[in-house]
């Protein structure tokens, strides 16, 4: 059993890799962006003149929501995250990213590393986050039992 899953209701990965992989009680979430299933991006607006405006706060919030959706598919939640790595195209966006991050996590949340990268797989992306969660098998089975009872 590989434990790897591509989640149909989310944006398809832009390569041959899963959204998530479960190994024992650990859940590994691949780098996740603000991309929607229809291949548009949260946090991208084009004005009437054709100028593209990118919003780090909206993208950060959407990335974290996408990670929450991925974790939910394997019986986890954001509070199960133990480590995240955030990739920013520009450290000039750190303040806006950090502001949204702090709405959801505090010093008791996951450990975090934030790095600047040259670019991400699409020019509209300002941020991508990967993570590791600890979701004991007993919690995952309880979640599956609840879903099956519905």
Give names to the regions the model predicted:
Residues 1-65, 69-82, 88-150:
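N-terminal presequence-like segments and the immediate start of the first folded domain
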């Amino acid at each position: 059993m590989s434990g790897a899953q591509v989640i149909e209701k989310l944006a398809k990965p832009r390569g041959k890799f899963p959204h998530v992989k479960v190994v024992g009680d650990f859940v590994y979430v691949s780098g996740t962006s603000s991309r929607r299933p229809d291949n548009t991006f949260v946090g991208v607006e084009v004005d009437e003149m054709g100028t593209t405006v990118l919003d780090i706060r909206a993208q950060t919030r959407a990335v974290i929501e996408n990670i929450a959706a991925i974790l939910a598919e394997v019986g986890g939640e954001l509070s199960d995250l133990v480590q995240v790595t955030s990739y920013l195209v520009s450290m000039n966006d750190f303040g806006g990213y950090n502001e949204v991050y702090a709405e959801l996590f505090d010093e008791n949340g996951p450990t975090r590393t934030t790095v600047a990268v040259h670019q991400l797989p699409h020019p509209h992306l300002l941020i991508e986050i990967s993570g590791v969660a600890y979701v004991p098998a007993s919690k995952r089975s309880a979640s599956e039992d609840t879903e099956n009872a519905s």
